[in-house]
Swiss-Prot record:
Source organism: Pseudomonas syringae pv. syringae (strain B728a)
Gene from which the chain derives: dctA
Name of the protein in its database record: C4-dicarboxylate transport protein
Cellular component GO terms, alphabetical: plasma membrane
InterPro entries for the chain: C4_dicarb_transport, Na-dicarboxylate_symporter, Na-dicarboxylate_symporter_CS, Na:dicarbo_symporter_sf
Disulfide bond residue pairs: none
Length: 450
C-alpha cells in the first residue's frame, strides 16, 4: 500500500501557486514581471529540446512492434477523419457564436488609424503559408534538419518511415528497436527532471504576460475574450463531452486525469509544453503505444479545436469592429479557407495568430490591419486555445484507439477513476516515475501490454 504524497509536493499544487504568484507580481510590479520572461521561455525551450526524440522513439517503437502494417494505415485514416470532422464543427461553432453575440459590433474602428507596424512580422509569416508549401514542408530537407528545427510533422513523417523500415527487417532489426526502447527511457527521465521546473516556468510566463499586457488590456476587448472563453468551455463540455460519453467515458474524469498537464499549458500558453507527458499518460490510459504515437503528434497540427474556434471568431470580430460587410458567401469562403489554413497551426504560442494573418491575406475581403485590434489580448486568448487543444487531443486519442480496437477499456475506467493520483508512486517501471533506466538483464521490450 502506498502513501499519498503531501499536496504541497504535487506538481498540480505547485503550478497553481506559481501561476497565482506570477499574476500578482505581473500586476503590482509589471517591470519585474516583464523581466521574468526568460523563465517561461527557458522552460518551453527545455521541453522542445526533447520533443523530437520522444516522438521518434514513441512512433518507431509503436509501429515496429505491431503485428500488421495495415493497422498503422487504419489508425492514421481514422485519426484524420476524426480530426477533420471535429475541427470543422469547432470552426462552425465559432462562426455561429460570433454572428449571434457580435462582440465587435459598434466599435466603428477606422482601419486607417490602426498601427500596422506591430503586426508586420505576423503578416509576413502568414503570407509565406500556402497549401502546397505546407505539404512540401512536411518532407524534411535532411533528417538532421527535421530534428534540429523541431518540426513535429517532419519528425513524425521520418519516424513513420523509419518504423515501417524497421518492421520490415524483422528479427534482424530487433537490436535497433531494443536500443530505441532504452533510449526512450532516458528521454522520459529527462522530461521527469525538466518537469520539476514547471512551476518556475509557469511563474515566469504568467508574470510576463500580466506585466507586459496588463489587466487593463483585457477590459477594452473583454467582450470578445469572455465570448471566446465561454465558447471554448461549452465546446469542451457539450461537443467533446458528447463524443466522450458516446465512447464510454466521462469528459470531466478525463480533464481531472490530465489536470497537471492542463495547468502547465495554462502557465505557458503552449499545448506543446505538455506533449511528452501526454504521450505517456494516454498510453497509461489504455491506448496502444502505436495509436498514441500517431494521434497525439499529428493532432498538434490537425486537431486544434481551440485554435479553430479562435480563427473564425477573430476573423469575423475584425470585420464587425471595422464595419466590413460579410455576407453568407464571404463567410462560407472564410470557412473553406480556414478548413485548410487551420491545419498548419502547430501547438506553440503565437501560431494561431500567424494562421489568422494568413487567412485574412488569403480571403482578401477582410482588412489585415485589423489584426492590430486583437494583438494585445492574443496572449490571453492563447491560453484558452491551448487548453481546448489539449483536451481535444486527449479525447481524440481515446476515441481513435477505440475505433481501431486498440483500447483497453478496463484500464481506461480504472485510470479515470483513480484520477492519475498514484502515477508516480505505484509504478516504478513507468517512464515518468523513475530516476533510473531499465534494470540490467531485464527484458528490453518496454512496450506495455494493454
Amino acid at each position: 500500500m502506498t502513501t499519498r504524497q503531501p499536496i504541497y509536493k504535487s506538481l498540480y499544487f505547485q503550478v497553481i501557486v506559481a501561476i497565482v504568484i506570477g499574476i500578482l507580481i505581473g500586476h503590482f510590479y509589471p517591470d519585474t514581471g516583464k523581466a521574468l520572461k526568460p523563465l517561461g521561455d527557458g522552460f518551453i525551450k527545455l521541453i522542445k529540446m526533447v520533443i523530437a526524440p520522444i516522438i521518434f522513439c514513441t512512433v518507431v517503437s509503436g509501429i515496429a512492434g505491431m503485428q500488421s502494417m495495415k493497422s498503422v494505415g487504419k489508425t492514421g485514416g481514422y485519426a484524420l477523419l476524426y480530426f477533420e470532422i471535429v475541427s470543422t464543427i469547432a470552426l462552425l461553432i465559432g462562426l455561429i457564436v460570433v454572428n449571434v453575440v457580435q462582440p465587435g459590433a459598434g466599435m466603428n474602428i477606422d482601419v486607417s488609424t490602426l498601427d500596422a507596424s506591430k503586426i508586420a512580422a505576423y503578416v509576413t509569416a502568414g503570407q509565406d503559408q500556402s497549401i502546397v508549401g505546407f505539404i512540401l514542408n512536411v518532407i524534411p530537407n535532411t533528417i538532421v534538419g527535421a530534428f534540429a528545427n523541431g518540426d513535429i510533422l517532419q519528425v513524425l513523417m521520418f519516424s513513420v518511415i523509419f518504423g515501417f523500415a524497421l518492421h520490415r527487417l524483422g528479427a534482424y532489426g530487433k537490436p535497433v528497436l531494443d536500443f530505441i526502447d532504452r533510449f526512450a527511457h532516458v528521454m522520459f527521465n529527462i522530461i521527469n527532471m525538466i518537469m520539476k521546473l514547471a512551476p518556475l516556468g509557469a511563474f515566469g510566463a504568467m508574470a510576463f504576460t500580466i506585466g507586459a499586457y496588463g489587466v487593463s488590456s483585457l477590459v477594452q476587448l473583454g467582450q470578445l475574450m469572455i465570448c471566446f472563453y465561454i465558447t471554448c468551455a461549452l465546446f469542451v463540455v457539450f461537443v467533446l463531452g458528447a463524443i466522450a460519453r458516446a465512447h464510454g467515458f466521462s469528459i470531466f474524469k478525463l480533464i481531472r486525469y490530465i489536470r497537471e498537464e492542463l495547468l502547465i499549458v495554462l502557465g505557458t500558453s503552449s499545448s506543446e509544453s505538455a506533449l511528452p507527458r501526454m504521450l505517456i499518460k494516454m498510453e497509461r490510459l489504455g491506448a496502444k503505444k502505436s495509436v498514441v504515437g500517431l494521434v497525439i503528434p499529428t493532432g498538434y497540427s490537425f486537431n486544434l479545436d481551440g485554435t479553430s474556434i479562435y480563427l473564425t471568431m477573430a476573423a469575423v470580430f475584425i470585420a464587425q469592429a471595422t464595419n466590413t460587410h460579410m455576407d453568407i458567401t464571404h463567410q462560407i469562403t472564410l470557412l473553406l479557407v480556414l478548413l485548410l489554413s487551420s491545419k498548419g497551426a502547430a501547438g506553440v504560442t503565437g501560431s494561431g495568430f500567424i494562421v489568422l494573418a494568413a487567412t485574412l491575406s488569403a480571403v482578401g475581403h477582410l482588412p489585415v490591419a485589423g489584426l492590430a485590434l486583437i494583438l494585445g489580448i492574443d496572449r490571453f486568448m492563447s491560453e484558452a486555445r491551448a487548453l481546448t487543444n489539449l483536451v481535444g487531443n486527449a479525447v481524440a486519442t481515446v476515441v481513435v484507439a477505440k475505433w481501431v480496437g486498440e483500447l483497453d477499456t478496463d484500464k481506461l475506467q480504472s485510470e479515470l477513476a483513480s484520477g492519475g493520483s498514484a502515477i508516480l508512486e505505484t509504478r516504478p517501471e513507468d517512464d515518468l516515475g523513475v530516476a533510473e533506466g531499465p534494470t540490467p538483464g531485464a527484458a528490453v521490450n518496454t512496450t506495455k501490454t494493454v
